[in-house]
Swiss-Prot record:
Changing residue 263 to A: Impairs the binding to oxLDL. Changing residue 232 to A: Does not affect oxLDL binding. Impairs oxLDL binding. PANTHER family: OXIDIZED LOW-DENSITY LIPOPROTEIN RECEPTOR 1. The chain crosses the membrane at residues 34-56. Its main location: membrane. Residues 1-14 have a biased composition (Basic and acidic residues). N-glycosylated. This is Oxidized low-density lipoprotein receptor 1. It comes from Bos taurus (Bovine). Highly expressed in endothelial cells, aortic intima and lung. Expressed at low level in other tissues.
Length: 270
């Protein structure tokens, strides 16, 4: 071996006295670049992991925000759906009420229409009756009531007995004279719904002070009873009036309504 063989010298240096090579130094030298590379890789991996953790945290926060936003949107949507359902329910109820109202109004309108048609028919009938009445000459003048053989008129104003007598005479009539229970019942029915007093043609005067009709005939006994006090102190005498079906005696000077009476023209009615 010569000095010019450096490899041989290196091999000699690497050999142990027993002829074996010292591998520890050589191995450490060979693994140093690998260790550095591994350290760099570990550092890069650590940085990567840190970056991933940071990104994961950001993503997690973003997901939480999105979930919160989604939850909020779901709450809003649920509220809108609930409000829409309530609105639909209210609309259905309103529609139902409106339908019932329309049906009720239609029913009332139908009833009104029927009543209107009935009134129209009655109006036509009334026109026919009035037309016939205009051409009919009855036993009593217009505005007089006919009962059996007599005509009766109820005054529209109140006067004393003497003035009421004059009014009846001007109508070619006389104050009421009741000759029968049937006639009394008729008069009672005619004034049943009135509370006013009506003069009759019955009075009590000097010198006899007995109840006499205008024609001088006396009152038929037991035909009706006269209530009230009879006084001879009345200058105009005591006169009779009928009120609510009962005959009363009173001062002739007082005012009351009256009932005029005259014979019906039965020949004209035939």
């Amino acid at each position: 071996m010569t000095v010019d063989d450096p490899k041989g010298m290196k091999d000699q240096l690497d050999q142990k006295p027993n002829g074996k090579t010292a591998k520890g130094f050589v191995s450490s030298w060979r693994w140093y670049p690998a260790a550095v590379t591994l350290g760099v890789l570990c550092l890069g991996l650590l940085v990567t992991v840190i970056l991933l953790i940071l990104q994961l945290s950001q993503v997690s926060d973003l997901i939480k925000k999105q979930q919160a936003n989604i939850t909020h949107q779901e709450d809003i949507l649920e509220g809108q759906i609930l409000a829409q359902r309530r609105s639909e329910k209210s609309a259905q109820e309103s529609q139902k009420e409106l339908k019932e109202m329309i049906e009720t109004l239609a029913h009332k309108l139908d009833e009104k229409s029927k009543k209107l048609m009935e009134l129209h028919r009655q109006n036509l009938n009334l026109q026919e009756v009035l037309k016939e009445a205009a051409n009919y000459s009855g036993p009593c003048p217009q505005d007089w009531l006919w009962h059996e053989e007599n005509c009766y008129q109820f005054s529209s104003g109140s006067f004393n007995w003497e003035k009421s007598q004059e009014n009846c005479l001007s109508l070619d009539a006389h104050l009421l004279k009741i000759n029968s229970t049937d006639e009394l019942e008729f008069i009672q029915q005619m004034i049943a719904h009135s509370s006013f007093p009506f003069w009759m043609g019955l009075s009590m005067r000097k010198p006899n002070y007995s109840w006499l009709w205008e024609d001088g005939t006396p009152l038929t006994p037991h035909l009706f009873r006269i209530q009230g006090a009879v006084s001879r102190m009345y200058p105009s005498g005591t006169c009779a009036y009928i009120q609510r079906g009962t005959v009363f005696a009173e001062n002739c000077i007082l005012t009351a309504f009256s009932i005029c009476q005259k014979k019906a023209n039965l020949l004209r009615a035939q």
